[in-house]
Amino acid sequence: KNSLLKYSEQYTTQKKIQRPSDDPTVAVRSLKLRTTYSQLTQYAEKNVKDAMSWMNTTETALSNISKKFDNMKSYLNQGANDYLKADDRKSVLTTLQQYVNSIFEDEANTDYSGRYVFTGYRTDTSLLFPENTDKLSYQIKENFSYDSFDNITVITGGANYDSTIANGQQYTDKTAKKNEVYQLRLAYDNCSKDAFAQAGTNGTSIAISFTYKDQTTGKDTTEVYAAAGYNGTPAAKGNIITRSSTDTNAYEVGDNEIVYLYDTGEVLVGKTKYADIQTKQADFSVTYVKNDFEKNDIRPEMYFKCTAYDSVNNKTTDYADPSDQEIEYEINYSQNIIVNTQAKDAISTDIYRMVDYISKTVKYVDEVETKIDEVDKMISNTTDKDKLATLNSLKTSLETERDLRSKVMTDAFGMGLTMIDEAGQKVSVATSELGAKYNRAQLTYNKLLDEQTDSEDKLSENEDVSLT
């Protein structure tokens, strides 16, 4: 009778046992197999899929950035190889700015299921400021190497119409001249000329710390150059001159001088100081202050070690160097995979800073061409020989300035091409590393599916009644 009942229950349920006491061995094995199957399902259907989706979202953004770089190259080529008329310059520049905005706003700020994919551990914080803010002040530490400088040509001087000038030679004497300087662009413009006001900081608007190996002693040596007010350690070896780019002597740099243009975020060094940096192959950090941020500016803590001060809440926050903020997923037993790529490792801030520089060179060409047009109108409206001679001298001087500034502008477009190649290489490396991790996750996923099937077969063999 018991056997008949047992077989009847097995036939109805198609299971070998109905309760653990029917066969403890089968019951224990079933528990282990079900636990294994549940874990495999968690890995395959949740962990690995989430990891692959995160990486796929990142890869899509990086791929879109690469495509936008390719599109930008054609416009940069136009500016580098052709003399563009004013309307064409405006069109090219506007297009470049739109691409840069799209790269950061649409791609670098992307998220997966509400988590920002390029912001390291701070997945709940956007890469960019969502709105203008004047309540935050940052002291930012940005690292560079000795080869980070650009050799650029700057135009100084230049003639302007002056109704009191009657001698054309006076305009000739004011003709613009070109100078070469070594330029370092910081990640931000519109920086502060004032010190970071919080206690424990270095008491100045900018300080540069050079580190190199002393050729005599073989020891690592640090030299600091700073603007007025510096009270850090070690003591400053030299001074940094602070100016605005609108100062008449903004780009006049002595051979051994360092000049900081706070409004454009530029550091300029003279040729002797530059040669010294190159000889020593000095790595260096620049610590500077920025007070106000516009909507879609990059949050400094996503790229740099920095200190933030919230003036509304009177709160100071120290942010460590954001390197190596790795987010890991467990995708199999004792097998983890890093799913995230940080913006600082893939998307260079040089992109928008270079377009800022191009914009400035275009602006200067536009301004001098406007001056020439105004002089042409004055020439056409007078028959006075002396005045014509004076105006023609002014025009000649302005045309010289236009030619000089046009060369600087085309060089800037050419530098943009080089920058895009370098930034594109950075994206390419990040994409390749991401692709390798994605392929590993895909192999793990396929293996998990096989193990799931095998686990199902073993579970069925252990639990199910064979009706054949």
Residue ranges: model-predicted function:
Residues 2-10, 15, 198-201, 207-225, ...:
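The ATP-binding site of the protein kinase catalytic domain
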Residues 4, 8-11, 15, 120, ...:
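Polar, low-complexity export/assembly segments characteristic of proteins
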Residues 163-165, 227-252, 310-317, 389-406:
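Surface-exposed intrinsically disordered loops and tails
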Residues 74-221, 268-270, 294-353:
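Amphipathic alpha-helical coiled-coil/heptad-repeat segments
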Residues 1-130, 389, 396-468:
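Amphipathic alpha-helical polymerization modules
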Residues 28, 49, 211, 221-222, ...:
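Intrinsic low-complexity, intrinsically disordered segments enriched in polar/basic residues
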Residues 215-286:
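Signature of Asx- and small-polar-rich beta-strand/turn repeats characteristic
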